[in-house]
Amino acid sequence: MAIERTLSIIKPDAVAKNVIGQIYARFEAAGLKVVAAKMAHLSKGEAEAFYAVHKERPFFKDLVSFMISGPVMIQALEGEGAILKNRDLMGATDPKKAAAGTIRADFADSIDANAVHGSDAVETAQAEIAFFFPGMNIYSR
């Protein structure tokens, strides 16, 4: 497998539960390295721009409202097969369908408040990382 980078967001519900460290421990145990990170409280404009791909979907307004409801922890992860590895760690979008031991099964409350976001492909990972970490704010280790 190739070394990849992926974007991960720990959403407001998980930040409020104070489980950032537990989620980071799972990244590291899976061989993923945090190569950039920041905490932010997204503006409505930032959330709308980031999730623009979903603009015509019925859940868009609720998604934006949720993502601006509190601070988020945003990180770029790096490692072999990072995109799929992170998606496996996250579990299914709906925590009721997520496998036991996944981040969403353990920390998410609902399909809306589902604890984490992760890039779904190489192209989206590149765009999402560039959105939050433009330029030289990423440090391979």
UniProtKB/Swiss-Prot annotation:
Q: Show the PROSITE patterns listed in the entry.
A: NDPK, NDPK_LIKE
Q: Which cofactors does this gene product need?
A: Mg(2+)
What InterPro entries does this protein map onto? Answer: NDK-like_dom (IPR034907), NDK-like_dom_sf (IPR036850), Nucleoside_diP_kinase (IPR001564), Nucleoside_diP_kinase_AS (IPR023005)
Main location (coarse class)? cytoplasm
User: Gene Ontology cellular component?
Assistant: cytoplasm
List, from the UniProt record, the residues annotated as the active site of this protein.
Answer: H117 (pros-phosphohistidine intermediate)
Stored CDD domains: NDPk_I (cd04413)
The record's annotation in Gene3D superfamilies points to: Nucleoside diphosphate kinase-like domain
Q: Which residues cross the membrane?
A: none
Which leading EC class covers this enzyme? transferase
Q: Which UniProt keywords apply?
A: ATP-binding, Cytoplasm, Kinase, Magnesium, Metal-binding, Nucleotide metabolism, Nucleotide-binding, Phosphoprotein, Transferase
Q: Which domain of life is it from?
A: Bacteria
Q: Which reaction does it catalyse?
A: a 2'-deoxyribonucleoside 5'-diphosphate + ATP = a 2'-deoxyribonucleoside 5'-triphosphate + ADP; a ribonucleoside 5'-diphosphate + ATP = a ribonucleoside 5'-triphosphate + ADP
Q: What is its EC number?
A: 2.7.4.6
The UniProt annotation places ATP binding at: K11, F59, R87, T93, R104, N114
Q: Where in the cell is it found?
A: Cytoplasm
Quick one: a GO biological-process term for this protein? CTP biosynthetic process
Task: Give any GO molecular function from the UniProt entry.
Answer: metal ion binding
SUPFAM superfamilies from the UniProt entry: Nucleoside diphosphate kinase, NDK
Q: Which family does the entry's similarity section mention?
A: Belongs to the NDK family.
**What job does the chain carry out?**
Major role in the synthesis of nucleoside triphosphates other than ATP. The ATP gamma phosphate is transferred to the NDP beta phosphate via a ping-pong mechanism, using a phosphorylated active-site intermediate.
Q: What is annotated about its quaternary structure and interactions?
A: Homotetramer.
Indicate what this protein is called per its UniProt record: Nucleoside diphosphate kinase
Q: Which organism is it from?
A: Polaromonas sp. (strain JS666 / ATCC BAA-500)
Which gene is the coding source of this polypeptide chain? ndk
